[in-house]
């Protein structure tokens, strides 16, 4: 007997998509440029840094041909600050820490300078314009010149990228044990917020509200999809039965009211 297909994308499929994230490596050997489906890979010339897809960087790491430089957010200090925002700031008590700005969205530095960012469109080989989105945004590359006013933020594939780098390149990370602990605590805190958001699903199921998912990661959405959709379906059925009972009650009241008014008119005519 075959099991029914799960709703939406599964966690292994999400992890597969996360392997397209661009990361920074420090090559140990020379490697000629490659033509991949996702685009051209520049030649690797030690000790010059290069940006590669995560799957290729992990392959070179396993072959001991490169070291992976951790992204700016995958350090103990930024993760501790994000965990503090998630747990101690009242404005994020029922919300998630802000994600990195997308192309065309102002950052903190842009707001301070009063500048308006410009979203730069890219073009396909046949000339069509498009705007990239994760995993095709540079949200996981190493940054040495990060602006101090920019608060740390978790990218869309933070959980997948962090676990992959901990498994395959823990020797390239700063204090991997603490990073693993912080990632676990962040996941528990954020999943608790998702589960606590069930209270507002009653209004969302009947079209009277919605659930804010700003800052939620891809794996978090994939893992909670079955739970949330099951709750919404159950609430929708309960709401439908309540609506049907309300309509029947209104119809009964209208019928009784119409009957009483007719009787009163007949009594007045007889009098």
UniProtKB/Swiss-Prot annotation:
Region described as Disordered: 93-130, 243-271
Source organism per UniProt: Aspergillus fumigatus (strain ATCC MYA-4609 / CBS 101355 / FGSC A1100 / Af293) (Neosartorya fumigata)
Chain's gene name: psf2
Assigned keywords, A-Z: Chromosome partition, DNA replication, Nucleus
Protein name: DNA replication complex GINS protein psf2
Function: The GINS complex plays an essential role in the initiation of DNA replication. Has a role in chromosome segregation.
Location within or outside the cell: Nucleus
Recorded superkingdom: Eukaryota
GO cellular component: GINS complex
PANTHER family given in the database record: DNA REPLICATION COMPLEX GINS PROTEIN PSF2
Subunit organization: Component of the GINS complex which is a heterotetramer of sld5, psf1, psf2 and psf3.
């Amino acid at each position: 007997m075959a099991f029914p297909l799960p709703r939406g994308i599964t966690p292994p499929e999400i992890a597969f998509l996360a392997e397209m994230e661009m990361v920074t490596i420090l090559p140990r050997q020379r490697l000629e440029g490659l033509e991949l489906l996702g685009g051209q890979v520049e030649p690797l010339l030690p000790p010059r840094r290069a940006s590669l897809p995560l799957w290729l960087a992990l392959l070179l790491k396993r072959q001991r041909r490169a070291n992976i430089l951790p992204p700016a957010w995958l350090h103990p200090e930024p993760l501790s600050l994000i965990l503090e925002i998630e747990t101690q700031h009242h404005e994020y008590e029922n919300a998630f820490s802000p994600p990195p700005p997308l192309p065309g969205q102002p950052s903190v530095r842009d707001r301070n300078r009063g500048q308006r960012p410009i979203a730069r469109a890219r073009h396909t080989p046949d000339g069509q314009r498009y705007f990239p989105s994760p995993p095709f945004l540079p949200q996981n590359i190493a940054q040495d010149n990060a602006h101090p006013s920019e608060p740390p933020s978790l990218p869309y594939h933070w959980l997948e990228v962090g676990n992959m780098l901990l498994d395959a390149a823990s020797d390239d990370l700063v204090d991997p044990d603490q990073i693993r602990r912080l990632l676990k605590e962040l996941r528990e805190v954020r999943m608790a917020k998702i589960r606590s958001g069930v209270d507002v699903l009653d209004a969302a199921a009947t079209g009277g509200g919605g659930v804010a998912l700003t800052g939620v990661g891809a794996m978090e959405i994939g893992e909670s999809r079955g739970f949330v959709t099951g709750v919404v379906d159950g609430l929708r059925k309960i709401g439908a039965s309540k609506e049907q009972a309300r309509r029947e009650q209104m119809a009964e009241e209208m019928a009784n009211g119409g009957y009483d008014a007719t009787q009163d008119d007949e009594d007045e005519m007889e009098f």
